[in-house]
Amino acid sequence: MLHLVDYALLKPYLTLEEVARGARRAEELGVAAYCVNPLYAPYVRELLSRVKLCVVADFPFGAMPTAARAALVARIAEYAEEIDVVAPIGLVKSHMWGEVRRDLLSVVGAAGGRVVKVIVEEPYLTDEERHRLYDIVAESGAHFIKSSTGFAEEAYARQLGNPTYSTPERAAAIARYIRERGFRLGVKMAGGIRTAEQAKAIIDAIGFGTDPTKVRLGTSTPEALRTLG
């Protein structure tokens, strides 16, 4: 099920040569999308034909002002098919829901119809915060809730009783909320998905089948998931 995989190379120390090599590998594997930082996107887009280019925005902190976030997303939308943007985490944790709503409406709107996955950073959230944020993501017109950047701080997550990695339980909870609310959102799980067994358990837990418009898995090690088919 490599057609559900977003192959991500997002470490800040990667060289252009390494990222270009990743693009060629993405094409060989036939993943859904190849996800990179904005700096590298113009260099690798010509290397992709059957694989979509995904670019992250305000990654990994979600701490830029709304105007800057929207401007960046609009620029990325000129050359990328998909955009993974981090939610304004500080505003979420401050429970400034009106500001969160204004931000995401502006940022998602700036994408001009490109596929947008909003990274909610599950490890940092309480259940109340999750649900309020999911509601706003749905209202914003985004296409996916994405679970995590994969860069979450373990010490803070532990204080909230949350893992920093993807689990079938968390995937099921997100999907269940989407179904109960009748949202037209997909689920992308990211963080610590390194085996085919993990991936299958998460896909099964989501319960949306194997449609890449509804289910994605983010990983930096797609080769490990090849046995999924």
UniProtKB/Swiss-Prot annotation:
It comes from the Archaea. Its EC number is 4.1.2.4. Belongs to the DeoC/FbaB aldolase family. DeoC type 1 subfamily. The active site is at D84 (proton donor/acceptor), K146 (schiff-base intermediate with acetaldehyde), K188 (proton donor/acceptor). It is found in: Cytoplasm. NCBIfam families: deoC (TIGR00126). InterPro entries: Aldolase_TIM, DeoC, DeoC/FbaB/LacD_aldolase, DeoC_typeI. This is Deoxyribose-phosphate aldolase. GO terms for molecular function: deoxyribose-phosphate aldolase activity. It comes from Pyrobaculum neutrophilum (strain DSM 2338 / JCM 9278 / NBRC 100436 / V24Sta). The keyword Cytoplasm applies.
